[in-house]
Every structure is written in structure tokens, then in C-alpha cells.
């Protein structure tokens, strides 16, 4: 009985990986064994950094809120404590946007919680 090989599936599998390796430098883009490892590593970095991205943005929002609050002589922690106590349901993303792009609206919130 002759050996059975599924060349169609094999080619499709390799083609998929090589397509993902487009734009890589050197042998990573055109040598199967190297490209396979490079794509696998890239996928693990992408997974890790999707989580990291959320942390980075949260810390950026906190920095922006802190900067806006300190202009009015209040620390970030004092401001956020008073925001929660007054029942203002704006999240950090929105507060940071107000502090950066709409300072007068942010100042109004600050005056409300003081």
C-alpha cells in the first residue's frame, strides 16, 4: 500500500504561518523552521502585551487625572476619594480625557467635589 500524504493540508498550514511571518527580517520571513518559531514567539508577545496594554493605559489615565487635580491643589487619591463619595460615576478614562482635552469641565468636577 502506498504512503498516504496530505500535501494540500501541509501546504495550507505552512502557507498560513509564512503569511503571518511577512514583514519579519532575514530568514524569519522565508525559512519555514525559523518563521514557525518567530511567529510562535510573536504570538506569545502579542498575548502578553494585550494584557500589559490595559495596565499601561490605566496608569496613563491616573497620571493625567493627577496632573489635572494638582493644578487645583488636590492630590489624585483625595480627588478620587471625593469623586466616589459624591457619587460621580465617571471612570478614569473619561476623567483623564476631561483633564486633558476639556480642562474647564474637569475644573467644574473638581469644584463640585471640593
Curated annotation (Swiss-Prot):
- Keyword Transit peptide applies: no
Q: Extract the PANTHER family matched here.
A: 39S RIBOSOMAL PROTEIN L20 (PTHR10986)
Family stated for the protein in its record = Belongs to the bacterial ribosomal protein bL20 family.
List UniProt keywords, sorted A-Z.
Answer: Ribonucleoprotein, Ribosomal protein, RNA-binding, rRNA-binding
Protein role: Binds directly to 23S ribosomal RNA and is necessary for the in vitro assembly process of the 50S ribosomal subunit. It is not involved in the protein synthesizing functions of that subunit.
Instruction: State the organism named in the record.
Output: Flavobacterium johnsoniae (strain ATCC 17061 / DSM 2064 / JCM 8514 / BCRC 14874 / CCUG 350202 / NBRC 14942 / NCIMB 11054 / UW101) (Cytophaga johnsonae)
UniProt cross-references to PROSITE patterns, sorted A to Z: RIBOSOMAL_L20
What protein am I looking at?
Large ribosomal subunit protein bL20
Amino acid at each position: 500500500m502506498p504512503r498516504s500524504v496530505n500535501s494540500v493540508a501541509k501546504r495550507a498550514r505552512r502557507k498560513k504561518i509564512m503569511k503571518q511571518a511577512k514583514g519579519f527580517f532575514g530568514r524569519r520571513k522565508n525559512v519555514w523552521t525559523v518563521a514557525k518559531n518567530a511567529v510562535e514567539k510573536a504570538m506569545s508577545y502579542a498575548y502578553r502585551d494585550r494584557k500589559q496594554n490595559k495596565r499601561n493605559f490605566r496608569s496613563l489615565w491616573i497620571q493625567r487625572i493627577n496632573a489635572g487635580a494638582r493644578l487645583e491643589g488636590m492630590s489624585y487619591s483625595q480627588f478620587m476619594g471625593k469623586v466616589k463619595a459624591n457619587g460621580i460615576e465617571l471612570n478614569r478614562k473619561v476623567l483623564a480625557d476631561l483633564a486633558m482635552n476639556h480642562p474647564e469641565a474637569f475644573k467644574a468636577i473638581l469644584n463640585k467635589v471640593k
